[in-house]
């Protein structure tokens, strides 16, 4: 796997596609098509089952419902009813958690 240079900006989609195309020898257009299909597949899985396991040990996406609640409006002071809301939650895999623990933060001593 090719090591990427550290820069202030994350890789763009096209840069990721280029890196994968060079590493695998597959055309960039085909890589883009594969990612489109993967996106559709994961979204369909998430909608139908509320849980989606990401490939290659990346983690898991799941839909949870935030409970309804009553919240005070700070401007008027009246109590407002906030309805339940679906949220997408990401649970990273153990590998990602371990890798993130090794990252040196720029604000750390």
Curated annotation (Swiss-Prot):
Gene3D superfamilies, per the entry: IHF-like DNA-binding proteins
Superkingdom of this protein's organism: Bacteria
InterPro entries cross-referenced by the UniProt entry: Hist_DNA-bd, IHF-like_DNA-bd_dom_sf
Name listed for the protein in its UniProt record: Uncharacterized protein MG353 homolog
Pfam families given in the database record: Bac_DNA_binding
Any one GO molecular-function label of the UniProt entry: structural constituent of chromatin
Residues in coiled coil: none
Native source organism of the sequence: Mycoplasma pneumoniae (strain ATCC 29342 / M129 / Subtype 1) (Mycoplasmoides pneumoniae)
